[in-house]
């Protein structure tokens, strides 16, 4: 049953310094680029900006999927790929003095390479302008093989560019994949993480789950075991918060104590880096391996 009560106290958090948030917002407008921090209204964005970390959203603000939890635009034709986007993002990284950057993207099932090439081009542009900046990738699943490149080929392009970490979020337990992740599958996401390890075992892999959609503790633990079976190194666990009334409702607010328990279970299962808490998101404290 969905919850309609007010947010628990542990989910209320100040946004951080207004000056840091406004600086990033101004640069985003200036360069015509996008961040998932702003598009997804992340509660941690002020904290991350203060730590010189940001997550850039590649390939425009419109997704070809329609996941029921996500704030990102969907439902109409995506924009043409901006060939200047890598250069613009690199300029923003340099201006902000970012030490750690996460690159993610909307799903672009309409493109022959599903957007993999834009990840590679953006990594190259950032490294040219800011050679000391580390780059983490948070990719879609590249499972729509209608184009010229298979899922494995798309992933291989990015792995060859040697990101500091390769992140792909499983998002929820097996039973809830259909209603939560329209267009994605549990097996396809596990295959992304397995493929990265097959191509380069030295690149750390990472995944994340949203809790509060109706999953049980037993289902969460089974999902963590599945992630470890494909060699996933790092994990984030956070509370699902619907961006609007038209998104999937919350079924349960997991307490900080429950998150701590799950985090300890994850460490016992062998994850090297674990961030588990109500306001944790997939890029939260990413520079620390979280």
Swiss-Prot record:
Transmembrane segments: none
Keywords: 4Fe-4S, Cytoplasm, Iron, Iron-sulfur, Metal-binding, S-adenosyl-L-methionine, Transferase
Primary location group: cytoplasm
Entry binding sites for [4Fe-4S] cluster 1: 37, 42, 48, 283
Pfam families reported in the protein's UniProt record: Radical_SAM
Gene3D superfamilies: Aldolase class I
Keyword Chloroplast tagged: no
InterPro entries: Aldolase_TIM, Elp3/MiaA/NifB-like_rSAM, Lipoyl_synth, rSAM
EC code(s) of this entry: 2.8.1.8
GO CC terms: cytoplasm
Subcellular localization, as worded in the UniProt entry: Cytoplasm
Catalytic activity: [[Fe-S] cluster scaffold protein carrying a second [4Fe-4S](2+) cluster] + N(6)-octanoyl-L-lysyl-[protein] + 2 oxidized [2Fe-2S]-[ferredoxin] + 2 S-adenosyl-L-methionine + 4 H(+) = [[Fe-S] cluster scaffold protein] + N(6)-[(R)-dihydrolipoyl]-L-lysyl-[protein] + 4 Fe(3+) + 2 hydrogen sulfide + 2 5'-deoxyadenosine + 2 L-methionine + 2 reduced [2Fe-2S]-[ferredoxin]
Annotated binding of [4Fe-4S] cluster 2, by residue: 63, 67, 70
Cofactor entry: [4Fe-4S] cluster
Binding note for cofactor: Binds 2 [4Fe-4S] clusters per subunit. One cluster is coordinated with 3 cysteines and an exchangeable S-adenosyl-L-methionine.
Single GO term (MF): lipoate synthase activity
Domain of life the protein comes from: Bacteria
Keyword match Phosphoprotein: no
Domain Radical SAM core: 49-272
SMART domains: Elp3
Known pathway: Protein modification; protein lipoylation via endogenous pathway; protein N(6)-(lipoyl)lysine from octanoyl-[acyl-carrier-protein]: step 2/2
Family: Belongs to the radical SAM superfamily. Lipoyl synthase family.
Matches recorded under HAMAP family: Lipoyl_synth
Name of the protein in its database record: Lipoyl synthase 2
